[in-house]
Amino acid sequence: AAFALPAFASFEKDVITPSVLEAVLNRKAPLSNIMMENDAILNVIANVKTVISNPVLEEALLKTNHGVNGIPCGESCVWIPCLTSAVGCPCKSKVCYRNSLDN
């Protein structure tokens, strides 16, 4: 049986990997000295993003052939902006990428 990965646009929601989700949850809220409420963030993310495994996302990224955009951050941005933009991963070609030249 052949297994074909759907294009990002065919997902019902944008996707995010568990490692990126953890990084977002550990990020401090902008202009605040307190940590963001993890439960509230998880509820929002569950409504707008689908958590998928790293290998599934990596395979889909290889098929889209947008490697020149930078290093994939583990999140798509077809409908919802990148949650990882707070950690330097803006949206390019429906995927959140980090500039490989930035430190």
From Swiss-Prot:
Gene Ontology terms describing biological process: defense response
Signal peptide (from-to): 1-9
Keywords for this protein: Disulfide bond, Knottin, Plant defense, Signal
Source organism superkingdom: Eukaryota
A Pfam entry, by short name: Cyclotide
Residue pairs linked by disulfide bridges in the UniProt entry: C73-C89, C77-C91, C82-C96
Cross-link (Cyclopeptide (Gly-Asn)): G70-N99
Record note on modification: This is a cyclic peptide.
Positions of the propeptide removed during maturation: 10-69, 100-103
UniProt key word Signal: yes
Free-text function comment from the UniProt entry: Probably participates in a plant defense mechanism.
Protein family per UniProt: Belongs to the cyclotide family. Bracelet subfamily.
Entry remark concerning the domains of this protein: The presence of a 'disulfide through disulfide knot' structurally defines this protein as a knottin.
Protein name per its UniProtKB record: Cyclotide vibi-K
Native organism: Viola biflora
